[in-house]
Amino acid sequence: MSHKKVERIDPLTQALPCVGCDSHAHLDGEEFDADREEVLARARAAGVATIGNIFLDPDRWRRRRGYFDAHPEVFFVLGIHPCDGQQCTPEVLADIREAFAVDDRLRAVGEIGLDFYWDDCPKEIQYQVLHDQLQLARELEKPVVIHCRNAEAETLMTLEARGFVGYPLLWHCFGGDADMARRIIRNGWHISIPGPVSYPANKA
Protein backbone atom coordinates (compact mmCIF):
# COMPACT_ATOMS: atom_id res chain seq x y z
CA MET A 1 0.00 0.00 0.00
CA SER A 2 1.39 3.39 -0.94
CA HIS A 3 1.50 6.27 1.49
CA LYS A 4 0.89 9.80 0.29
CA LYS A 5 3.53 12.22 1.48
CA VAL A 6 2.06 15.05 3.53
CA GLU A 7 3.32 18.47 2.51
CA ARG A 8 4.33 20.47 5.55
CA ILE A 9 3.35 24.12 5.99
CA ASP A 10 6.03 26.74 6.44
CA PRO A 11 4.60 28.89 9.26
CA LEU A 12 6.77 31.85 8.32
CA THR A 13 5.41 32.09 4.78
CA GLN A 14 1.85 31.02 5.58
CA ALA A 15 1.07 32.85 8.78
CA LEU A 16 -2.36 32.76 10.36
CA PRO A 17 -4.88 34.93 8.49
CA CYS A 18 -6.01 36.34 11.82
CA VAL A 19 -4.33 36.56 15.20
CA GLY A 20 -3.95 33.31 17.12
CA CYS A 21 -3.32 32.27 20.72
CA ASP A 22 -1.00 29.54 21.92
CA SER A 23 -2.77 28.76 25.17
CA HIS A 24 -0.12 26.42 26.56
CA ALA A 25 3.64 26.85 26.34
CA HIS A 26 6.60 26.08 28.59
CA LEU A 27 8.98 28.73 27.29
CA ASP A 28 10.58 29.13 30.71
CA GLY A 29 12.21 25.72 30.23
CA GLU A 30 15.97 25.42 30.13
CA GLU A 31 15.77 24.02 26.61
CA PHE A 32 14.79 27.51 25.41
CA ASP A 33 17.59 29.38 27.17
CA ALA A 34 19.66 29.55 23.97
CA ASP A 35 16.98 30.87 21.61
CA ARG A 36 13.93 32.02 23.60
CA GLU A 37 13.84 35.43 21.89
CA GLU A 38 14.02 33.83 18.45
CA VAL A 39 11.18 31.45 19.33
CA LEU A 40 8.99 34.35 20.45
CA ALA A 41 9.86 36.28 17.28
CA ARG A 42 8.91 33.31 15.09
CA ALA A 43 5.61 33.00 16.94
CA ARG A 44 4.81 36.64 16.20
CA ALA A 45 5.76 36.18 12.55
CA ALA A 46 3.42 33.18 12.33
CA GLY A 47 0.48 35.23 13.62
CA VAL A 48 0.50 34.16 17.27
CA ALA A 49 -0.51 37.27 19.21
CA THR A 50 -0.88 35.79 22.71
CA ILE A 51 0.95 33.00 24.53
CA GLY A 52 0.12 31.40 27.86
CA ASN A 53 3.26 30.25 29.66
CA ILE A 54 2.71 27.50 32.21
CA PHE A 55 4.87 27.58 35.33
CA LEU A 56 4.86 24.18 37.04
CA ASP A 57 5.67 25.45 40.53
CA PRO A 58 5.93 28.80 42.31
CA ASP A 59 9.72 28.64 42.52
CA ARG A 60 10.03 28.44 38.73
CA TRP A 61 7.59 31.36 38.41
CA ARG A 62 9.69 33.40 40.83
CA ARG A 63 13.02 32.62 39.14
CA ARG A 64 11.94 32.74 35.49
CA ARG A 65 9.03 35.16 35.11
CA GLY A 66 11.56 37.89 34.31
CA TYR A 67 12.38 36.19 31.01
CA PHE A 68 9.15 37.69 29.69
CA ASP A 69 9.44 41.25 31.01
CA ALA A 70 9.77 42.58 27.45
CA HIS A 71 6.92 40.41 26.16
CA PRO A 72 3.51 41.65 27.33
CA GLU A 73 1.90 39.22 24.88
CA VAL A 74 2.84 36.39 27.27
CA PHE A 75 0.49 35.74 30.17
CA PHE A 76 1.17 33.30 33.00
CA VAL A 77 -0.51 30.18 34.38
CA LEU A 78 0.65 28.60 37.65
CA GLY A 79 -0.17 25.32 39.35
CA ILE A 80 1.12 21.89 40.32
CA HIS A 81 1.04 19.23 37.60
CA PRO A 82 -0.65 15.97 38.69
CA CYS A 83 2.59 14.01 38.22
CA ASP A 84 4.21 16.35 40.76
CA GLY A 85 1.38 16.02 43.25
CA GLN A 86 3.61 14.87 46.11
CA GLN A 87 5.26 18.30 46.06
CA CYS A 88 1.96 20.09 46.66
CA THR A 89 2.19 20.82 50.38
CA PRO A 90 0.10 23.42 52.24
CA GLU A 91 3.16 25.68 52.08
CA VAL A 92 3.33 25.38 48.29
CA LEU A 93 -0.37 26.17 47.98
CA ALA A 94 0.15 29.24 50.15
CA ASP A 95 3.06 30.23 47.91
CA ILE A 96 0.85 29.94 44.82
CA ARG A 97 -1.83 32.04 46.50
CA GLU A 98 0.72 34.74 47.28
CA ALA A 99 2.03 34.69 43.70
CA PHE A 100 -1.44 35.47 42.36
CA ALA A 101 -1.74 38.31 44.86
CA VAL A 102 1.35 40.10 43.54
CA ASP A 103 1.44 39.28 39.80
CA ASP A 104 -1.43 40.40 37.59
CA ARG A 105 0.03 38.47 34.65
CA LEU A 106 -1.03 35.25 36.39
CA ARG A 107 -4.38 34.57 34.75
CA ALA A 108 -5.27 30.95 35.56
CA VAL A 109 -4.55 28.01 37.87
CA GLY A 110 -2.95 25.15 35.96
CA GLU A 111 -2.00 22.87 34.64
CA ILE A 112 -3.86 20.74 37.16
CA GLY A 113 -5.76 17.49 36.82
CA LEU A 114 -5.26 13.73 36.73
CA ASP A 115 -2.59 11.75 34.87
CA PHE A 116 -2.91 7.97 35.07
CA TYR A 117 -0.55 7.35 32.13
CA TRP A 118 2.57 7.90 34.19
CA ASP A 119 3.14 6.25 37.55
CA ASP A 120 4.83 9.26 39.15
CA CYS A 121 2.24 10.04 41.81
CA PRO A 122 -0.34 7.85 43.60
CA LYS A 123 -3.89 8.39 42.38
CA GLU A 124 -5.24 9.30 45.80
CA ILE A 125 -2.68 12.11 46.08
CA GLN A 126 -3.55 13.33 42.59
CA TYR A 127 -7.23 13.54 43.54
CA GLN A 128 -6.45 15.49 46.71
CA VAL A 129 -4.11 17.90 44.92
CA LEU A 130 -6.71 18.47 42.20
CA HIS A 131 -9.37 19.18 44.82
CA ASP A 132 -7.08 21.58 46.69
CA GLN A 133 -6.20 23.53 43.55
CA LEU A 134 -9.79 23.68 42.32
CA GLN A 135 -10.70 25.17 45.68
CA LEU A 136 -7.83 27.65 45.30
CA ALA A 137 -9.03 28.66 41.82
CA ARG A 138 -12.50 29.39 43.21
CA GLU A 139 -11.00 31.38 46.06
CA LEU A 140 -8.89 33.42 43.64
CA GLU A 141 -11.72 33.66 41.09
CA LYS A 142 -9.36 32.46 38.37
CA PRO A 143 -9.97 30.11 35.43
CA VAL A 144 -8.63 26.56 35.44
CA VAL A 145 -6.35 24.81 32.93
CA ILE A 146 -6.85 21.05 33.05
CA HIS A 147 -4.22 18.41 32.29
CA CYS A 148 -5.76 14.97 31.76
CA ARG A 149 -4.17 11.79 30.46
CA ASN A 150 -5.74 8.33 30.62
CA ALA A 151 -8.18 9.71 33.20
CA GLU A 152 -10.89 11.37 31.14
CA ALA A 153 -13.93 9.88 32.87
CA GLU A 154 -12.45 10.43 36.33
CA THR A 155 -11.55 14.05 35.58
CA LEU A 156 -14.97 14.83 34.13
CA MET A 157 -16.77 13.29 37.09
CA THR A 158 -14.56 15.16 39.57
CA LEU A 159 -15.16 18.52 37.91
CA GLU A 160 -18.90 17.97 37.58
CA ALA A 161 -19.26 16.67 41.14
CA ARG A 162 -17.44 19.72 42.51
CA GLY A 163 -19.77 22.12 40.74
CA PHE A 164 -17.44 23.34 38.01
CA VAL A 165 -20.00 23.11 35.21
CA GLY A 166 -20.08 26.59 33.68
CA TYR A 167 -16.85 27.64 35.40
CA PRO A 168 -14.15 29.18 33.13
CA LEU A 169 -12.02 26.17 32.21
CA LEU A 170 -9.67 25.10 29.42
CA TRP A 171 -9.12 21.40 28.75
CA HIS A 172 -5.49 21.40 27.64
CA CYS A 173 -4.23 19.06 24.91
CA PHE A 174 -7.62 17.41 24.40
CA GLY A 175 -7.28 13.81 23.27
CA GLY A 176 -10.75 12.38 23.76
CA ASP A 177 -13.47 11.37 21.32
CA ALA A 178 -16.36 13.35 19.84
CA ASP A 179 -18.77 12.41 22.65
CA MET A 180 -16.35 13.65 25.27
CA ALA A 181 -15.79 16.87 23.33
CA ARG A 182 -19.54 17.47 23.20
CA ARG A 183 -19.84 16.87 26.95
CA ILE A 184 -17.03 19.33 27.67
CA ILE A 185 -18.63 21.97 25.46
CA ARG A 186 -22.07 21.39 27.04
CA ASN A 187 -20.43 22.05 30.40
CA GLY A 188 -19.40 25.48 29.15
CA TRP A 189 -15.69 24.68 28.94
CA HIS A 190 -13.11 25.15 26.20
CA ILE A 191 -10.83 22.69 24.43
CA SER A 192 -7.32 23.35 23.17
CA ILE A 193 -6.34 21.46 20.04
CA PRO A 194 -3.03 19.61 20.47
CA GLY A 195 -0.28 18.89 17.99
CA PRO A 196 -1.13 15.17 17.61
CA VAL A 197 -4.24 16.05 15.56
CA SER A 198 -1.81 16.62 12.69
CA TYR A 199 -0.48 13.05 12.81
CA PRO A 200 -1.47 11.18 9.61
CA ALA A 201 -2.84 8.19 11.57
CA ASN A 202 -5.34 10.30 13.52
CA LYS A 203 -8.89 10.77 12.24
CA ALA A 204 -11.22 13.69 12.79
Where are these regions (language model features)?
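Mid-domain alpha/beta scaffold segments of enzyme catalytic cores
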Residues: M1-A204
